[in-house]
Regions:
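Metallocofactor- and cofactor-centric catalytic cores in central/energy metabolism, strongly enriched
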Residues: 1-32, 42-51, 57-139, 143-147, ...
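Short, hydrophobic beta-strand segments
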Residues: 36-40
Length: 198
C-alpha cells in the first residue's frame, strides 16, 4: 500500500508541475458537461435539494451545455415519467429496457429491488415507498427532454442537452463513471442525518 501511495503522490506532483504554467481561459458553456447524483434520500430530497440540481440542469441545457444523470436503480417506479421525456419513442423504450435489465441482474443475485427499498434510513427520513424515493430522485434531472441513454463507458463527444447514463447508484461507481464520461463538474447532494440509519 505504501508504494501505491508514494506512486500516487509522485504522479500528482508531476501533473501539478505540468499544468502549473497553464492559464485559465474563458470557455463557452456549450463545452460544459455536468454530471448529477443524489445520495441518501429523505422526504425533503424531492422538495428541496434535488429541485435545485434540476433547476441548474435545466439552465445548463438552455445555455447549450450537456447534463448527464444516472442511478438506474433510482428510476424504479418512475421510469414511465422519464420515458415520456424521451425525444423519441426509442429513447423511452431504452429507459424501460435499462430499468428492466438492472432489476433482472439484481434478481439473478437474489435481490428484489422493489422489496428492498426504501432503506431503513430512507424510511426514518420520511419516505414510504420505492416509488416515492424515485420520484424525488428524478427531480434532479430537471424538466428538459432526454436526448438518449448512454452506456456506463460512453464518453461525451458532441452530445448536447440532457442524457441518461446507465449506472449503479453507489457513489464510487457513479462518480467515477461521470468523471470518465467527461463531466467537468458533478453535483451531488445527500441527507447527512440518514447515514446513522443506513
Amino acid at each position: 500500500m505504501t508504494n501505491a501511495i508514494a506512486e500516487g503522490v509522485r504522479a500528482a506532483q508531476k501533473l501539478s508541475m505540468q499544468i502549473s504554467g497553464m492559464q485559465r481561459q474563458p470557455v463557452d458553456i456549450s463545452n460544459y458537461v455536468m454530471g448529477i447524483k443524489c445520495g441518501g434520500s429523505d422526504a425533503t430530497s424531492g422538495l428541496a435539494s434535488n429541485c435545485v440540481i434540476g433547476y441548474v440542469a435545466d439552465k445548463i441545457v438552455d445555455l447549450g451545455g450537456t447534463v448527464v444523470f444516472g442511478e438506474t436503480t433510482e428510476f424504479i417506479g418512475a421510469e414511465h415519467i422519464l420515458a415520456r421525456r424521451g425525444v423519441t419513442p426509442e429513447v423511452g423504450a431504452k429507459i424501460f429496457e435499462k430499468v428492466a435489465a438492472m432489476e433482472a441482474r439484481a434478481k439473478s443475485l437474489g435481490c428484489d429491488m422493489r422489496k428492498g427499498q426504501p432503506t431503513p434510513g430512507n424510511i426514518a427520513g420520511g419516505l414510504s415507498s420505492i416509488e416515492e424515493k424515485s420520484l424525488g430522485a428524478i427531480v434532479k434531472s430537471g424538466t428538459k427532454p432526454i436526448q438518449g441513454v448512454m452506456e456506463y463507458a460512453d464518453i461525451v463527444t458532441d452530445q448536447k442537452g440532457l442524457w441518461i447514463k446507465d449506472t449503479p447508484g453507489r457513489e464510487i461507481e457513479i462518480l467515477t463513471g461521470m468523471a470518465a464520461t467527461g463531466a467537468q463538474c458533478i453535483l451531488s447532494v445527500s441527507c447527512t442525518h440518514l447515514r446513522a440509519h443506513e
